[in-house]
Amino acid sequence: MSAVLAEQEAAQQALSPTDNRLVPRTELEAREVDALKANLVRYLDFEAQLLPGFRPLFREYEVGTKESVEYAGVRLAGRIDRIDVDGAGRAVVIDYKGSLSADYEPFATEGRPPAKVQTLVYAQVVKRLLGLDVVGALYVSYGRAPKVAGAYDGRVLETPHLPNMRYERCACPPEGERSFARLLDETEKRAASAVRALLAGQVDPAPAGPASCAWCPVTACLSRED
């Protein structure tokens, strides 16, 4: 692992700034890179427990660059960190994060839709684009305390294979409003509504979750959540 990290660190110098290269320019940034490498080494044991019946099919899968992809009534472009599949052709969409909050748990707040929808969007796109049976849309933190959040079909994925997850806030039942398929469809409907509002010039503050206002400097906002 140390050799791989050294190789990747050296390769950053040849990348352009538009490639989001990781090149420290100060002593503080150099220490941050060292901390990141230490976290990744510690993360290996956690990764070995994650989804043992699945294998990576795609890494850094680009969406909307070679083909036109529509989601919520508009063209979508992005990059999916990882798509895993099992022997039955079922797939899990994975996005890596440095840390995770309750906003990444779709059922963290009763009666409120998911605050973070990135992997839910990509899961719907993967179903359409690749024809895969997507059963999970996960966020995986590689930070000092690795954990998993997101949504998954509770009939397919087993809790021991999703370490450090609050399952009651993430598992989808087989049927009903909280089923995984229904969650993907409802998320797209919400996204379409938001797109229409933006195109109409409606930009009223509407916090999506408890942490949405954490870094907002507008303290006098009536919609602010503390």
Predicted features, each with a name:
Residues 1-226:
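Structural signature of nuclease core domains in nucleic-acid processing machines
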